[in-house]
């Protein structure tokens, strides 16, 4: 399974020209860009781009170089990111005038889900990925608070929004008109492919041969054994602290 990379197109009076490579945007085949936010991160008046990537590819923070190009400075701004970043939103959450960042992931909400889904790397794999150039990525939502000095700090656990299970899009806006931005997270997946019981079932040699045969009936039969996991959406009210 491979992604298609990210693409940037320049508007030329109603016509678009791809400038991905010349602008410094990464377009790797392992990129699964599921979220993008365009905003002025560093306060210089120029729009920057944050891309949240699912699976192994890290997230990217492209800082506008004011000449039609961008530079990835994610490692300079963030100590770590979500492992499988899905949705992302950049909004001021504490009314200090600086943009903050929220990304969604798939950390289960309860102990049962935590123990029945395969959501984490073992330490050996984690270390090997760091040595291979991957970044510090953890299976959890991240709420990156802007420290106003070119750095962000993740306060998701402190704020109670680190775990919302299999989450996709996130929207941060003032839901109750009190002047403070609140958080909405949409959740759920039709078939839970991270279920460890299904993983053991799928590892059976007979089942693997059925899938590799390429016959639709065989594949459908396997997919029917993936459990469904309905999950509620989540809404968090900003307590202003």
Regions found by a protein language model. Name each.
Residues 1-241:
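Acidic, glycine/proline-rich Ca2+-coordinating loop motifs
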């Amino acid at each position: 399974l491979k992604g298609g990379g990210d693409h940037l197109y320049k508007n030329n009076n109603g016509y678009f020209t791809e400038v991905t490579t010349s602008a410094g945007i990464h377009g790797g085949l392992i990129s699964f860009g599921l979220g993008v936010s365009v905003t002025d991160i560093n306060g210089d008046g120029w729009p920057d781009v944050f891309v949240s990537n699912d699976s192994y590819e890290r997230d990217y923070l492209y800082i506008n170089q004011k000449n039609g190009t961008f530079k990835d400075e994610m490692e300079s701004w963030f100590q770590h990111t979500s492992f499988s970043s899905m949705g992302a939103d950049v909004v001021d959450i504490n009314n200090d005038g600086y943009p903050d960042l929220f990304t969604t992931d798939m950390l289960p909400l309860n102990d049962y889900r935590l123990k029945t889904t395969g959501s984490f790397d073992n330490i050996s794999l984690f270390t090997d990925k760091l040595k291979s150039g991957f970044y510090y990525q953890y299976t959890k939502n991240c709420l990156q608070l802007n420290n106003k000095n070119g750095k962000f700090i993740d306060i998701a656990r402190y704020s109670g929004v680190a775990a919302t299970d299999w989450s996709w899009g996130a929207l941060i806006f003032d839901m109750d008109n009190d002047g403070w931005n609140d958080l909405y997270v949409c959740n759920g997946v039709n078939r839970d492919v991270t279920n460890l019981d299904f993983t053991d079932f799928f590892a059976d040699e007979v089942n693997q041969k059925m899938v590799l045969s390429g016959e639709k009936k065989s594949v459908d039969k396997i997919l029917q054994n993936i459990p469904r996991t309905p999950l509620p959406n989540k809404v968090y009210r900003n307590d202003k602290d």
